[in-house]
């Protein structure tokens, strides 16, 4: 029985793919005079910024994070886009008594800003950001915290995401997992984490939950 659906935010509920790509490109060029390929950048989607930048220059992590966040904030409202039918999907889940949470690696201020900009923040019963937990995706702690806040066991939760980090976090917590095929990552990359289920588009989450609860 699925009593709660937990979502990653960027690339799952909100289309921030262009925003993230432009923010990384600007940061790498400005700070390190590097121009990584779009494929190289995309492969990092879903990882915490600190981990990503550490692999490029461990002595300038904070500078790079600050640079990234500055340009991300400047571009944010123009570059955030909706995925089709996300609002309808969330509204329908709520109407069926399903609890809804977000589990994101994005800091709370920008995560909430994006969710409010898209008009979907009102649907969330819990909103887990990196400030709330000691460990982060792919560790299961953020998913466990969301389940605790919602009063459900991990086995009663479905974690939905566009990156292996989302899927592994769900698995490590003992939740069921669902990958979204509209991910910006190569599908085989997402597949390496072996999601229990896949959906082609957000509305299919409704059919999946209904199937699991039948």
Swiss-Prot record:
User: What biological-process terms (Gene Ontology) are attached?
Assistant: DNA repair
Q: Which InterPro entries match?
A: HAD-like_hydrolase_sf, HAD-like_sf, HAD-SF_hydro_IA, HAD_2, HAD_sf, PGP-like_dom2, Pyrophosphatase_Ppax
| Reaction equation(s) it catalyzes | diphosphate + H2O = 2 phosphate + H(+)
Molecular function in Gene Ontology: inorganic diphosphate phosphatase activity; magnesium ion binding; phosphoglycolate phosphatase activity
- Please provide, in alphabetical order, the Gene Ontology terms of the cellular component aspect for this entry: cytosol
Active-site residues, Swiss-Prot/TrEMBL: 8 (nucleophile)
Entry EC number(s): 3.6.1.1
Question: Which Pfam families does this UniProt record tie to the protein?
Answer: HAD_2 (PF13419)
Cofactors that this protein relies on: Mg(2+)
Keywords carried by this UniProt record = Hydrolase, Magnesium
Q: Which PANTHER family match?
A: PHOSPHOGLYCOLATE PHOSPHATASE, PYROPHOSPHATASE PPAX
Q: Can you tell me which family this protein belongs to?
A: Belongs to the HAD-like hydrolase superfamily. PpaX family.
> Can you say what this protein is called?
Putative pyrophosphatase PpaX
Q: Which organism is it from?
A: Clostridium perfringens (strain 13 / Type A)
């Amino acid at each position: 029985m699925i009593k709660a659906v937990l979502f990653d935010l960027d690339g799952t509920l909100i289309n921030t793919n262009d925003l993230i790509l432009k923010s990384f490109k600007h940061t790498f060029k400005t700070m390190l005079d590097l121009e990584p390929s779009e494929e190289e950048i995309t492969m990092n989607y879903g990882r915490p910024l600190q981990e990503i930048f550490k692999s490029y220059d461990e002595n300038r992590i904070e500078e790079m994070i600050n640079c990234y966040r500055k340009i991300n904030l400047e571009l944010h409202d123009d570059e955030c886009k909706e995925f089709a039918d996300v609002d309808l999907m969330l509204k329908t889940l709520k109407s069926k008594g399903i609890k809804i949470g977000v589990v994101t690696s994005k800091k709370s201020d920008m995560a909430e800003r994006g969710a409010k900009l898209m008009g979907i923040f009102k649907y969330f019963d819990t909103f887990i950001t990196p400030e709330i937990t000691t460990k982060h995706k792919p560790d299961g702690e953020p998913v466990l915290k969301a389940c605790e806040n919602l009063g459900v066991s991990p086995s009663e939760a479905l974690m939905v995401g566009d990156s292996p980090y989302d899927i592994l976090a769900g698995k490590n917590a003992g939740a069921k997992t669902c990958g979204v095929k509209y991910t910006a990552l190569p599908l085989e990359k997402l597949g390496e984490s072996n999601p229990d289920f896949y959906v082609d588009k957000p509305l299919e989450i409704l059919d999946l939950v209904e199937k699991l609860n039948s």
